[in-house]
């Protein structure tokens, strides 16, 4: 998208207005080889994805003839740069439906992991693997990001290869609704980081943070917002 004026930005957000106000959740996890205690390599991941296809009916997603993800009934499975596996959930009405969706996926993932000698770890930061030893996969976008991201943040590669997390996507019904939800989420994010902090360890030693993931994401090229977004003069909640 080429931005030529302020209205281009306004129109982009206006085009996203929805009346149903659904939510969707993206959930990432690390995968480890239980025989080596190391992160799963791409060859391991391909076998895991094949289990989802043959056992649970998922459909493959390929790039340059490489298996890089799956799709099924509004959901998709994709790989992050360090082979973190991500479920991008369907558009749902409430968190109860999200909970059911995630539990169903976890059952399938546990079964596929058992068949491929893998195990999952749902932490914000890989507690044992050094960055130089993190695995990768053949997605073209990640090759570009690996070269470009460090130019804008000293921990950008750590963010790409060593972190996992949960993202919540929410519809908005109007410009006013967007402003209220956006500002509220800006305020709630630090609280969520504190409540769900589970990444105090990295490279087998204490990081000095309860959430080292949060520390890493403050030093990347793609995170953070100007303080103007929190100015009280913008909107009252």
Feature roles, as predicted:
Residues 1-154, 162:
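Terminal catalytic/cofactor-binding subdomain
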Residues 79-85, 134-138, 169-176, 218-229:
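A broadly tuned preference for mixed-charge, low-complexity surface segments
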Residues 108-112, 160-177, 204-215:
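Short secondary-structure transition/capping segments
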Residues 116-122, 190-210:
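Flexible helix-coil linker/hinge segments at domain or subdomain boundaries
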Residues 235-237:
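Conserved small/polar residues in nucleotide/adenosyl-binding loops
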